[in-house]
């Protein structure tokens, strides 16, 4: 059976970049563990804020955290009160000085991670998986995606035997390195078990053919 390589890992260093951007010598492991803790804590804390990705940079004893979200108002709060509280809570995890930047996602319907989380939430609310997949695909294509593929795997519809169902519209060239492929994964925790949702969104070519 053909296995799918992670589209972001496959393109690192060519058309994609890392979500953790810093260099370290001896304390590399400590900083990496800090990053993992910060990411896990933020994902839990901002579960309802439509967070797509968290990019961490560390310039000179600082930790600059860029949160990519579709709902910046929820994170910032009234007069920036919530973001200050967030900053103080993160200071308990890291020894560095914390700076938080909020990056707004203009088209959440075409962001692979947010689409995957949206489909997973619908599956948890017992919406029919085919309907939620179809709705997500239609929305992404309407907002300018050139192609999208959604995979749902698990006990779909409460079936005894787990299976994989997928739906695709447009083209999704996974082997073309210059193709801008956005990938997202989420889990739906249903009463029957966990359903995995994978989303690939093709947004066009980054480098045109010479």
From Swiss-Prot:
Any one biological process term the GO annotation gives: translation
PANTHER family: 30S/40S RIBOSOMAL PROTEIN S3 (PTHR11760), SMALL RIBOSOMAL SUBUNIT PROTEIN US3C (PTHR11760:SF19)
GO cellular component: cytosolic small ribosomal subunit
Upper lineage: Bacteria, Pseudomonadati, Pseudomonadota, Alphaproteobacteria, Magnetococcales
Sorted UniProt keywords: Ribonucleoprotein, Ribosomal protein, RNA-binding, rRNA-binding
GO molecular function annotation: mRNA binding; rRNA binding; structural constituent of ribosome
Subunit structure, as described in the record: Part of the 30S ribosomal subunit. Forms a tight complex with proteins S10 and S14.
InterPro entries: KH_dom (IPR004087), KH_dom-like_a/b (IPR015946), KH_dom_type_2 (IPR004044), KH_sf_prok-type (IPR009019), Ribosomal_S3_C_sf (IPR036419), Ribosomal_uS3_bac-typ (IPR005704), Ribosomal_uS3_C (IPR001351), Ribosomal_uS3_CS (IPR018280)
Full protein name: Small ribosomal subunit protein uS3
Record organism: Magnetococcus marinus (strain ATCC BAA-1437 / JCM 17883 / MC-1)
Stated family: Belongs to the universal ribosomal protein uS3 family.
Keyword Transferase: no
Record's function text: Binds the lower part of the 30S subunit head. Binds mRNA in the 70S ribosome, positioning it for translation.
Residue span, KH type-2 domain: 38-106
Keyword RNA-binding included in the entry's annotation: yes
Record-annotated membrane-spanning stretches: none
